[in-house]
Structure formats: C-alpha cells, structure tokens
Design a protein with these regions (language model features):
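Short amphipathic alpha-helical boundary/capping segments
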Residues: 10-12, 105-113
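Short, small-hydrophobic-rich alpha-helical interface motif
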Residues: 21, 25, 36-47, 66, ...
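Short helix-coil-helix linker/hinge
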Residues: 100, 110-118
C-alpha cells in the first residue's frame, strides 16, 4: 500500500513540524493568524505534492522555503492592506518570561521592515537558522543573507529608537 505509507509519513512530518511552520508564519505575518494559516496550508500542500522527491532530503527546509516564498509573493501581489496584530503572535520559548508590551512593540516594528528583510530576521533570529540554511530557504547567496540581515537590524534599531523617542515625549 504505497499511498498509505506516503500518507502516514507525511502525517508524521506534519505532526512534528506544523508548530514550527506556524510560528514562522505568525512572525512573517506579524500576528495575522488567518494569513499565517493560509501560508502554512500552502506550504504543506506543496510538500505533500512533492513528498516522494523531498522526504528523504528533508521536508523541513523545503517547507520553510515554500512558506517564505508564499509570503513574499503575497506581499508583492497585494496592495498595502491593514495588518492585524494578535496578542499571541509570538509564543515565547522557554527562555523566560517576556513582557507583552515589548512583544507588541517588536511586532509593530517588524511591520515597518520590508518583507524580504523581515523574512531574513524571522529565519535567522526566531527560527535559529544559520546563514547557509537561511540562504537555502530564501534561494539566495549567503552574502545576500548577511547584507539583508544587517540592513534589517539597522532598520529595526531605527524604528525601535523612533518608537522609544515617541514614548518619552
């Protein structure tokens, strides 16, 4: 029963990686749960279609690449539309308690960063991918990942500094 084995293997993959995909999608969409679920569904659909080819190589990197590409495609196609920010967009890891106000500030700041740069930050710092893995997911050179990371961090610093100055007034 070859189809059954494929379905079983795919189901096991989804059970193991869906949370990570959803976390990445939530970060990319700055907390828009519905858009994040759409991205994850798109990624998992493509993973399933190509399962025979990719499951031995590792479906995770492929799924994350599809997820990021779907996000970037959506941003290119769509006219600027309001971004929704939900309280549970960031699910802090077990590194300790994180102030909800700080998370909201970071989420809002991420909205002001170009989608490609936001994707680099999410993959590098929230998904803990190294430069080479990030380059594979984004289908670009390692140098591009490094330069986009530097530009994104500078932009994030500028936005956060501006927000802090506004709050102090």
């Amino acid at each position: 029963m070859p189809g059954g084995d494929r379905d079983h293997e795919f189901r096991e993959y989804v059970l193991g990686d869906r949370t990570r995909l959803m976390r990445t999608a939530m970060l990319l969409t700055a907390g828009d749960r519905y858009a994040a679920e759409d991205l994850v569904q798109t990624a998992l659909t493509k993973v399933y279609v190509h399962w025979r080819r990719i499951h031995h190589e590792g479906a995770g990197p492929y799924a994350h690449r599809v997820l990021v590409n779907a996000f970037l495609d959506d941003r290119r196609r769509a006219a600027r539309r309001p971004e929704l920010i939900s309280a549970d967009a960031f699910e802090p890891r077990s590194h300790g308690e994180v102030d909800a106000a700080d998370l909201l500030t970071v989420r809002k700041a991420l909205l002001e960063i170009a989608p490609r740069q936001r994707a680099v930050l999410v993959l590098r710092y929230f998904q803990d991918l190294d430069v080479a893995e990030c380059a594979r997911v984004l289908e670009c050179s390692e140098g591009t990942v490094k330069s986009q990371t530097a530009k994104a961090l500078k932009r994030l610093r500028d936005v956060m500094t501006d927000r802090a100055a506004e709050g102090a007034e």
